Each structure stands twice: as C-alpha cells, then as structure tokens.
Amino acid sequence: MITKRQLLKLSLGLVAAASGATVMAADTSPIKIGLILPMTGQSASTGRQIEAAVKLWVAQNGDKVAGRKVEIILKDDGAVPDATKRIAQELIVNDKVSVIAGFGITPTALATAPLATQSKTPLVVMAAATSSITEASPYIIRTSFTLPQVTIGIADWAAKNKIKKAVTLVADYGPGFDAEKFFDSQFRLNGGQILDKLRTPLRAPDFAPVLQKVLDAKPDALFVFLPSGQGAAFMKQFAERGLDKSGVRLIATGDVTDDDQLNDMGDVALGVVNSHHYSAAHPSPTNKKFVDAFQAANKFRPNFMAVGG
C-alpha cells in the first residue's frame, strides 16, 4: 500500500517535472500549489476538513521543500465545475502554480482534467472518488479513495449476513453510478437480488419520495451512497418515514455516516453498517496521534476527507 509520505514524494516529483528543471540551490522562489475546495455550499464540510488537514501537515512538517517555501493558494469553487475550471485556469496562467490539488466532487476534477493535460500541470485529487478520474489525464494522481474500493466489501458483507433482497439508493452522478454498479454486480454474484435502483439529485435532494419506494418494495436491506455532507439530512428522513423501525437494514458507504456529522444523527445511526477506507475511531497508535493533533488544532474531529488532504 502506498503511504502518505510516498504520495508526498510523488507530488513533489511532479512539482519538479512541472517546473521543467531540477530544483537548483540558487532558486529560492516559492513553490506555488493551488488548492481548490468547496468552502461554501452543501459540500463545505469537505473543504473544511481538507483545509484543516493541510494546515496541520504544514504546522507539523514546515513549509519548505529543498530550501524553497511552499505557498498554498486556497480558492473556493463551491463544488461548481464551471467555477473550478475558471479558477484552475487563473491559477495556471496568473499565479503560475506548479500543482493544483483539492477537488471535492468528481465533476470538478473532470472539468479541470483537460487543463492539466494542456498545461502539463499535475492535479492531486484529495476527495473525488469516481474510479475513472485518473483516466481523464496522465497528470492526475489521487490521495483519497474510489467507490469500488469501499462498495464491494459491503456487498460481500450483506451476502454473508442473510441479506437476500436489496434496494440501492445513490446520488445521481459519477460516484453514485460507481457505487450502484459495483454493489449490484457483487451482490448478485453472491446470489442476492436487487429489487430497485433509486437515484436522487446531487443538489438539494428530497429523500421522501424514494424512501417511500423503499418501504413499498420491502427489501431486506437498503444500500446507500450519498456524498459527504448529505448524511444527516438523509438519516433524519429515514427515521421520519419509519424505516428505522420497519425491519429494513441500512447498509452504506462511510460517506453517509461520516465522522464530521455522526453526532448530529442521533440514535437512528445505531445499527447502520458501512464500509469505508477510514474511521476516526480506528485504534492504531498512528491514527490516535493524528486524531488528537487534528482535534487540538481545529476543535472538531477529522473524517475521511481529512486523510485525503
């Protein structure tokens, strides 16, 4: 498994490649890194987590590489792809950044990919999780995760826990399509049956109509993928519709019950089973050290987006 330190070295190698020359001792100009994140809007939690993680890393490791200061230029795109593309263009042309990082959702990463190829500017995807993103440009690397990575495991778990019939509910965009596709194929491979495939809009979703369809279908379980930030609203409507007492098991990717919002969900989150690549509750000494430092610096706990930053 590639470590975060190895990813850092790879990113710095891309910085050197982007500059077109080996960094010389006499060159003391700053290395500029554009950081495009959703700091406002429904994905603001993602931006807040990644920005906090970046600041923590700099505080712990310093802001110089090979004698050159690293200058991070933070820009808010509100998770709007057109804004992301415009901001990336400005960072490349006006600020002359060596690397652009961030990208809270898949459409923003894909919107910027052609610019990366044209300008030969490396992109470091810290959040967006559609599996095909890294195929959009040879200049893209990812520090986060992919939906197949976390979806196949929960499909296997369902089959081993007497779940025979399921409904899928996903957000209507790239990661949702990945989650739906890979859960469906793995669940059916294990002998399960998909009763219905439901999708909700990425922006301002109303879960009530689709949750009624779930009640009507009477599956053994409901599998859910939603982007980070929508979990609390979904869990609230899940309880309001009585699904928490209907006998339908709720299984999900970890985005739905992410650590940043879990405390706001109340008891309805008890019993939810999810699969993900990170949890702040992981008991390893390395993670405990990270969580303690993150909370001390920010007064809130990290979630899976923070480790991508």
Listing of model-derived features with the role each one plays in the protein:
Residues M235-G309:
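Extracellular/periplasmic periplasmic-binding protein-like sensory domains
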Residues S45-I50, K64-S132, T143, T200-F207, ...:
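Beta-alpha junction/loop-to-helix N-cap segments that form part of ligand/metal-binding clefts
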Residues R86, T130-S132, Y139-R241, Y278-K289:
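Extracellular/periplasmic Venus flytrap/periplasmic-binding protein
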Residues G34-A53, W57, K75-D82, G104-P107, ...:
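Extracytoplasmic "Venus flytrap"
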Residues T28, E51-I72, L189-G192:
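Signal peptide-proximal N-terminal region
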Residues M1-V15:
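N-terminal secretory signal peptides and thylakoid transit peptides that target proteins
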Residues L91-G104, V124-M126, V167-V170, K218-S228, ...:
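Periplasmic-binding protein-like
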